[in-house]
């Protein structure tokens, strides 16, 4: 009987918020990535009781120095060369942006092929900017040029580029403009999430992946989730990033991640819960039962 040689999982450093109750930030990203087969080294930028969508919460925002201190400890274990990528989301304060970019630099120094995926959490349609007013400019100036993959929602793409997105042509133009500002040594992928445009079929929502090899659009039915569920953007950033690291294909990653996200949100809707049902939907993350195929648009 042939023996199978065991292999170690790949490793991702994820720097985001954390909540004790519910699923946003690292609490929405770590588990899906683990289900995709990754070891995740979680570094938390805040430790809140629950997400801020409830209007009240408790807990601290961590000082930027905490991130560097935790990286010191990880580096002391001699494992940074084994880190395959960095994922960042909600950062909490301006100094934390520089700390995240510093962490990316340290990982790349140890492992030059490591990919940085930046979810530029700043705001959303209907809510406007919900972070400190200084953060959008700092993210644009520091995190975006370091990123290999960036996953803005429609509001954040407009904020980062100054371009209004109302049609598919608008979305492609803005995504290409942002893509030109990403790390020139990387794949330069823009994943535009929660795209709602005037020239799309009714009752649908789309995600657009723009790369140097082409652009793909994935459309799913728009579920009547009111209010919109917090953590959705954190989950899709993690799912897309993980699937891209697994497949090396933006098209495949878009199909698989959006199909998994739809299954997650559909189950959340059917159960009628305020929090996204990550644990209940976990079987959909690696191999979604129903695929929404990405369509090439350029």
UniProtKB/Swiss-Prot annotation:
Its cofactor is Mg(2+). GO terms for cellular component: cytosol. Keywords: ATP-binding, Kinase, Magnesium, Nucleotide-binding, Transferase. Pathway: Cofactor metabolism; pyridoxal 5'-phosphate salvage; pyridoxal 5'-phosphate from pyridoxal: step 1/1. One of its GO terms (molecular function) is pyridoxal kinase activity. It holds the Pfam family Phos_pyr_kin. One of its GO terms (biological process) is pyridoxal 5'-phosphate salvage. Substrate binds at residues 17, 234. Its EC number is 2.7.1.35. It catalyses: pyridoxal + ATP = pyridoxal 5'-phosphate + ADP + H(+). InterPro entries: PM/HMP-P_kinase-1, PyrdxlKinase, Pyridoxal_kinase_PdxY, Ribokinase-like. ATP binds at residues 119, 156. Homodimer. Belongs to the pyridoxine kinase family. PdxY subfamily. Pyridoxal kinase involved in the salvage pathway of pyridoxal 5'-phosphate (PLP). Catalyzes the phosphorylation of pyridoxal to PLP. This is Pyridoxal kinase PdxY. It comes from Deinococcus radiodurans (strain ATCC 13939 / DSM 20539 / JCM 16871 / CCUG 27074 / LMG 4051 / NBRC 15346 / NCIMB 9279 / VKM B-1422 / R1). The gene is pdxY.
């Amino acid at each position: 009987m042939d023996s199978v040689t065991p292999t170690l999982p790949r490793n991702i450093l994820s720097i985001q918020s954390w909540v004790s109750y519910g699923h946003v930030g690292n609490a929405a990203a770590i588990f899906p990535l683990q289900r995709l087969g990754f070891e995740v080294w979680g570094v938390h930028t805040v430790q809140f009781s629950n997400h801020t969508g409830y209007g009240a919460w408790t807990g601290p925002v961590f000082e930027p120095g905490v991130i560097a201190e935790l990286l010191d400890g990880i580096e002391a274990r001699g494992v940074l060369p084994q880190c395959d990528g960095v994922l960042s989301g909600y950062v909490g304060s301006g100094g934390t942006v520089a700390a995240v970019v510093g962490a990316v630099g340290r990982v790349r120094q140890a492992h030059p092929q490591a990919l940085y995926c930046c979810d530029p959490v700043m705001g959303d349609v209907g809510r406007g900017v919900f972070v400190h007013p200084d953060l959008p400019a700092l993210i644009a100036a520091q995190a975006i040029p370091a990123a290999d993959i960036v996953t803005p929602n429609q509001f954040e793409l407009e904020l980062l580029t100054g371009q209004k997105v109302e049609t598919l042509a608008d979305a492609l133009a803005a995504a290409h403009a942002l893509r030109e500002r990403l790390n020139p040594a990387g794949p330069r992928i823009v994943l535009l999430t929660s795209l709602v445009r005037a020239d799309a079929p009714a009752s649908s929502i789309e995600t657009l992946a723009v790369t140097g090899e082409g652009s793909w659009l994935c459309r799913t039915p728009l579920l009547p989730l009111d209010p919109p569920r917090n953590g959705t953007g954190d989950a899709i950033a993690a799912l897309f990033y993980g699937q891209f690291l697994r497949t090396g294909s933006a098209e495949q990653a878009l199909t698989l991640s959006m199909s998994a996200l739809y299954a997650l949100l559909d189950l959340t809707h059917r159960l009628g819960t305020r929090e996204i049902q990550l644990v209940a939907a976990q079987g959909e993350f690696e191999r979604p039962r129903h695929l929404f195929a990405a369509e090439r648009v350029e």
